[in-house]
A protein has these predicted regions:
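Ordered alpha/beta subdomains of enzyme catalytic regions
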Residues: 1-116
Length: 116
């Protein structure tokens, strides 16, 4: 986390790992891909919102730096892995896969500040 992000997101600065700050569905899908042997295939994911904020009919794109930093630093800590194993029942092979996870990404994005 950058110093700037820590200033604007102080609650996140307390947490070494944001890997579990997701819907369990996403981790279940990772597990399914892993068990089917397709975890390393290319995949496409999107980040979006459902409605314009504040009901004003438009939005301004912001936050790309935050997304890039999150993805660059994404890792599962040992406490994350222990939680997933003990509470969600994932097997040791998947836990090891998460422990050694290295993302290979191409990010396509709107420009920061563009109106949506």
């Amino acid at each position: 986390m950058t110093e700037r992000e820590a200033m604007f997101y102080p609650e996140l600065a307390k947490d070494d790992s944001l890997a579990l700050h997701t819907d369990l569905y996403e981790i279940n899908m990772m597990y399914t891909y892993f068990k089917k042997g397709i975890a390393d295939r290319n995949a496409v994911f999107e980040s979006f919102y459902r409605r314009e904020p504040f009901g004003n009919g438009y939005a301004v794109y912001a936050g790309l730096e935050h997304i890039i930093n999150y993805l660059k630093n994404l890792k599962f800590t040992e406490s994350d892995l222990q939680y997933l194993k003990e509470n969600e029942g994932y097997d040791d092979d998947f836990i090891d896969y998460l422990r050694n996870l290295k993302l290979k990404l191409t990010i396509r994005s709107m420009k920061e500040g563009e109106q949506l």
